[in-house]
Design a protein with these regions (language model features):
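N-terminal Sec-pathway targeting helices
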Residues: 1-10
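Aspartyl protease catalytic domain
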Residues: 110-263
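Short, ordered beta-strand-loop transition motifs
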Residues: 86-92, 176, 240, 309
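Duplex nucleic acid-engaging cores and interfaces of nucleic-acid transaction enzymes
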Residues: 38, 44-45
Length: 329
């Protein structure tokens, strides 16, 4: 595990201080403090050590380490990826996972020109792509959930309620304080003032770090191409430290996809889109959305998918400047 150090030094007589930090990362990171104080007639100094949280390698018979995808940012590593074989009995089936540090990123949601479904005349659907204003700090983009016609679900972003929230459904939310979570929705049809983004899709797939009982009912998790039970599936989870984990894998039932997410140590997870056409996770090699690369090797997708007008809604991950800031629009 790589360690990053934050050092605070205070010199009393010299009236000099300095602080080296990465903005607002600490609330989701594990820390250990070991103060060391030395005294003399001239100065006093205190050193505080902080260990930055990194996810452990994914180990299923063999261990698969995480790879940093945003070294060009020259800041806290915020998007890491790995691939692994979730079930040793089927070694040809590989799962692709991305870990997103929520304390140093902004998770944003964008409508496409078809999804979410038809809305009232005059409703602002936004840029329907990654806007130019956000591209200098764009780190990743990935697919969202079902069309509303395929599963009624709430959709809220940029102070606009495109579809009302549905009680009991799995919901990814971003709050005004910058925190992100995946929850079972128990609120009103319209999110409260402390929520800046909310997207629902079906019930929870994983809860309390275990597959939910409903995950065993494959018919409850969407129509599959050709009616086969095991298809490409994607999911989004939250770990115990409050960081997001996206995963995509072929040949999965709802139940096996839930197991994939538990192998990634999520506390809760929701299924996103399914079937071969939709899985996509893109990383970027430089500021300005340069060097777009498909992390999930889907021949039905292209790296620049969300840099142009998109049919379906999608998520974008930006390097954060301050907690809870409005997403680029």
């Amino acid at each position: 595990m790589r360690r990053y150090w934050v050092v605070i030094a205070v010199v009393t007589l010299g009236a000099t201080g300095f602080l080296l930090r990465q903005a607002h990362q600490a609330h989701a990171d594990s820390t250990s403090t070991g103060p060391s104080t030395t005294s003399s007639s001239t100065s006093t100094s205190m050193v505080t050590t902080t260990t930055l949280y990194r996810p452990a390698a994914v180990c299923v018979r063999v261990c698969s380490p995480w790879r940093v995808m945003d070294p060009w940012l020259h800041a806290v590593p915020s998007v890491l990826t790995t691939s692994f074989v979730p079930f040793p009995a089927t070694p040809s089936v590989v799962a692709y996972a991305a870990w997103i540090r929520t304390s140093s990123t902004d998770l944003s949601l964008y409508p496409g020109y078809k999804g979410p479904g038809p809305t009232a005349a005059g409703v602002d659907r936004g840029p329907m792509m990654v806007p130019a204003s956000g591209r200098p700090r764009l780190l990743a983009t990935f697919n969202s959930g079902f069309y509303e016609a395929d599963g009624a679900a709430g959709f809220y972003v940029n102070h606009t309620l495109y579809f009302p929230m549905v009680d009991g459904l799995a919901t990814v939310v971003r709050y005004t304080n910058g925190r992100v979570d995946i929850i079972r929705w128990t609120g009103a049809a319209r999110p409260g003032a402390n929520i800046v983004m909310a997207r629902q899709n079906l019930p929870l797939l994983v809860n309390a770090s275990k597959p939910t009982p409903l995950s065993a009912d494959n018919a409850a998790w969407g129509l599959t191409l050709g009616g086969v039970p095991a298809v490409w599936r994607t999911a989004l989870g939250i770990d115990a430290q409050g960081n997001l984990i996206y995963a995509a894998a072929p040949s999965q039932t709802a139940a096996s996809m839930a197991v994939v997410m538990t192998r990634l140590h999520v506390v809760r997870a929701m299924q996103l889109d399914i079937n071969p056409e939709w899985p996509i996770f893109v990383t970027y090699g430089a500021s300005g959305a340069i060097g777009a690369t498909l992390f999930v090797p889907n021949p039905n997708q292209i790296p620049g998918r969300f840099l142009y007008s998109s049919t379906k809604d999608f998520f974008a991950v930006y390097a954060s400047r301050r907690p809870g800031e409005a997403q680029p629009w």
